[in-house]
């Protein structure tokens, strides 16, 4: 682009003999003027004062007019022949070393007073520099610029920054990059009174042409000085694409939370436009199998669903093709070839197998599966069709698992299980059905599938506690456990003890507890002898402070009561009802209400009546405290209930503030009273005696503390022996007896606690 501009400049300077002769006369006149102005050019003020890059030079009468007329015809501003071409040759890298050196020398400044008669060009010259030129004319430009370099034998580069001029040493070939590295804030001045400046009024940082254009100034009152402006836009690093800058005027929605568009990472295929293949009914029966394979291969193309407007026609062609394949499998019976198995499995892998990153909350907090909403797959229209097509393919009566097992192998199963971590519940539901069908078809893969699922559960329990598909895997296992043959293998019992029971300790139990409870009940139905191990495992992981999780455990215990055998119930009744008694006294009314609702179950009620001699003494104190509070409420009337102090005392004494809980506890005690009144009276008497003993121990403890306080008041420090002495001997004896009584009371309490346990 610069070559054409240089060619026009050369033509202008060499166009007429009159212009060349006049220029020689101008050079001689300027040499005479330079000798007179050398004293003034040595002043630093004149060298650094020209910040606007203006140029003042004398022009010849004939030569300038002729060049001006030619410049107007070509759409450019008049220039001064060879000297102008040497200055403008700095706009781009010269084609020859001579042109680059001459252009850089013409841009430098001389302290000794040597001047050059360069005249700056205007913005029109910059526009002309973008046009295409011939390479041969750039060589002429180099020769013309070298002649101008001879006129300046000792150039010195001076860069002014922050009103301070720094002079460099004499360089044989000063370059533009050297000037750029100095980052000048003021133009480079020359003593001759001419200046070369770049046109940066457009302010474009994306300017691809690093042009330093010369322009004529209209202000003649400025001091005659020559300078070079190196614009910031000419820096090489600023030519790189810059990031989008925020507009301060625009309003930013800082409250809006970012949205994740997909829970997995698909890799779209290279864009290849799809063409609609003919329908199956449009071809002959012999061509349907090749057409089937061609349609399956066509579905291997992946689309980017992050851009809804991208290739809408291609997405629709793929969806309709999958629908045609599904309809063809359902409505036709034919023998599947080996090639069909390979292409179908390959298409399933390409469309569905992909890495699934861990879920991350876009706000920045830890992802909570209970509160954060899952992100659905944007490509679900195609994924759903692929799942349905593969499911129809596997369920088809023409499917031969002997041929398919070389394609649906262990690696296929592992990748399929990884997809269960998808956040999209629709995909997990399709995966559940697909894996279950594969488990039923491929007998050789059953043990591997169970073992792989066990590994996922173990990693979930003891390492990550994050996996989205636990509920779906447990649902598959529920149907698998239901089909176990009796007696159960040791492998299945180990799975119950080491996998299913420890699953209760995970914090996100609520996501899969119904499926887990179903698996536990299925095991107990298969083998009732496992009841003791299951109940003791639940009591081991029983929550201490999480009331919501405690209600889940109580629901599971209720399900176990439905299938428990009477003989197995006897083995676990003591530890189980000790925990249930604690739940009855729980301040959380839903926990107490859930336990007391067991008495509405007829089977549970029969078990309690048959084993009342063991059960009633354990739960009687908890039930009696609730009923005594109900009697207190009835005796005092409604006024006492409205009293806030009575409500606080009620919550402390009875363990529950809900009156409905008191009524349910009274109903449970009434059942025991009616079925076995003798046992009820014995338990009542035992409870009252224990209450009296507790009161006596409380009074005795208070007396002992009072004696101890009196003993401390009568102590005095013996400074000689550093021992404590008692002033009154009677107090010494009373203190000794009080300490002995405290020791005996503590031993009695420990004995009572051990007997209850």
Swiss-Prot record:
Subcellular location per the Swiss-Prot or TrEMBL entry: Cytoplasm; Nucleus
Biased composition (Basic residues): 1-11
Composition bias type Low complexity, residue spans: 12-21, 35-66, 86-119, 128-147, 197-216
Biased composition (Basic and acidic residues): 23-34, 160-172
Positions where Phosphothreonine occurs in the chain: 242, 257
MF GO annotations: DNA binding; protein phosphatase activator activity; protein phosphatase regulator activity
GO CC annotations on file: cellular bud neck; cytoplasm; kinetochore; nucleus; protein phosphatase type 2A complex; spindle pole body
UniProt-listed PANTHER family: SERINE/THREONINE PROTEIN PHOSPHATASE 2A PP2A REGULATORY SUBUNIT B, SERINE_THREONINE-PROTEIN PHOSPHATASE 2A 56 KDA REGULATORY SUBUNIT GAMMA ISOFORM
Function of the molecule: The B regulatory subunit might modulate substrate selectivity and catalytic activity, and might also direct the localization of the catalytic enzyme to a particular subcellular compartment. Multicopy suppressor of ROX3 and HSP60.
UniProt-recorded name of the protein: Serine/threonine-protein phosphatase 2A 56 kDa regulatory subunit delta isoform
Taxonomic lineage from the root: Eukaryota, Fungi, Dikarya, Ascomycota, Saccharomycotina
């Amino acid at each position: 682009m610069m070559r054409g501009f240089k060619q026009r400049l050369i033509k202008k300077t060499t166009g007429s003999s009159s212009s060349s002769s006049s220029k020689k006369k101008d050079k001689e006149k300027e040499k005479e003027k330079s000798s007179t102005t050398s004293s003034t050019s040595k002043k630093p003020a004149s060298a650094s004062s020209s910040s606007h890059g203006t140029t003042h030079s004398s022009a010849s009468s004939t030569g300038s007019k002729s060049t001006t007329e030619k410049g107007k015809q070509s759409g450019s501003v008049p220039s001064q022949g060879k000297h102008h071409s040497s200055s403008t040759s700095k706009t781009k890298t010269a084609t020859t070393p001579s042109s680059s050196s001459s252009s850089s020398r013409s841009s430098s400044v001389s302290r000794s007073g040597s001047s050059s008669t360069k005249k700056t060009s205007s913005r029109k010259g910059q526009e002309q520099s973008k046009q295409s030129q011939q390479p041969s004319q750039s060589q002429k430009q180099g020769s013309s610029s070298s002649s101008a370099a001879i006129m300046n034998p000792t150039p010195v580069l001076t860069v002014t920054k922050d009103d301070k001029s720094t002079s460099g040493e004499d360089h044989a070939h000063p370059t533009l990059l050297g000037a750029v590295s100095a980052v000048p804030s003021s133009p480079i001045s020359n003593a001759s009174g001419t200046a070369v400046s770049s046109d940066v009024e457009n302010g474009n940082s994306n300017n691809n042409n690093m042009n330093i254009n010369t322009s004529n100034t209209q202000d003649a009152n400025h001091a005659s000085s020559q300078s070079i402006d190196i614009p910031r836009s000419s820096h090489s690093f600023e030519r790189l694409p810059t990031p989008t800058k925020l507009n301060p005027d625009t309003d930013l929605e800082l409250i809006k939370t970012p949205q994740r568009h997909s829970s997995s990472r698909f890799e779209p295929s290279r864009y290849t436009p799809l063409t609609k293949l003919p329908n199956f009914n449009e071809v002959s029966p012999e061509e349907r199998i090749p057409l089937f394979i061609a349609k399956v291969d066509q579905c291997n193309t992946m689309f980017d669903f992050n851009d809804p407007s991208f290739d809408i026609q291609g997405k629709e062609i793929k969806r309709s093709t999958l629908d045609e394949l599904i309809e063809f499998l359902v409505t036709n019976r034919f023998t599947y070839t080996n090639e069909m198995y390979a292409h179908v499995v390959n298409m399933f892998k390409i469309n569905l197998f992909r890495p699934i990153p861990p879920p991350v909350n876009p706000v920045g907090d830890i992802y909570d599966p209970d509160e954060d909403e899952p992100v659905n797959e944007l490509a679900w229209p195609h994924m759903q069709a692929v799942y349905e097509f593969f499911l129809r393919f596997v369920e088809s009566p023409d499917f031969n698992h002997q041929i398919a097992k070389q394609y649906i192998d262990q690696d296929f199963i592992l990748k399929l299980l990884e997809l269960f971590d998808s956040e999209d519940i629709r995909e997990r539901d399709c995966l559940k059905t697909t894996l279950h069908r594969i488990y039923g078809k491929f007998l050789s893969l059953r043990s591997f599938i169970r073992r792989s699922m066990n590994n996922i559960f173990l990693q979930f329990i003891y390492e990550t506690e994050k996996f989205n598909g636990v509920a779906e895997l447990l649902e598959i296992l529920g149907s698998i456990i239901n089909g176990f043959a009796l007696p159960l293998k040791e492998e299945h019992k180990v799975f119950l003890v080491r996998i299913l029971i420890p699953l209760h300790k995970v914090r996100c139990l609520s996501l899969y507890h119904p499926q887990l409870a179903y698996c536990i009940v299925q095991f107990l139905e298969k083998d009732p002898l496992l009841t003791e191990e299951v109940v003791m495992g639940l009591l081991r992981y029983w929550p201490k402070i999480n009331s919501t999780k405690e209600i889940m455990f109580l629901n599971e215990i209720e399900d176990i009561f439905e299938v428990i055998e009477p003989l197995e119930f006897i083995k676990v009744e003591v530890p189980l009802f000790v925990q249930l008694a604690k739940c009855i006294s729980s301040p959380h009314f839903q926990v107490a209400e859930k336990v007391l609702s067991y008495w509405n179950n007829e089977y549970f009620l029969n078990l309690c009546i048959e084993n009342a001699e063991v059960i009633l003494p354990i739960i009687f104190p908890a039930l009696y405290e609730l009923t005594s509070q109900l009697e207190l409420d009835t005796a005092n009337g409604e006024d006492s209930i409205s009293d806030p102090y009575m409500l606080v005392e009620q919550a402390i004494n009875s363990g529950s503030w809900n009156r409905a809980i008191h009524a349910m506890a009274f109903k449970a005690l009434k059942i025991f009273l009616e079925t076995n009144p003798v046992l009820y009276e014995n338990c009542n008497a035992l409870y009252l005696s224990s209450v009296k003993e507790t009161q006596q121990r409380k009074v005795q403890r208070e007396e002992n503390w009072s004696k101890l306080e009196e003993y401390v008041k009568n102590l005095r420090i013996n400074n000689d022996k550093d021992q404590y002495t008692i002033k009154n001997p009677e107090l010494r004896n009373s203190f000794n007896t009080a300490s002995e009584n405290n020791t005996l009371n503590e031993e009695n309490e420990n004995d009572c606690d051990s007997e209850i346990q």
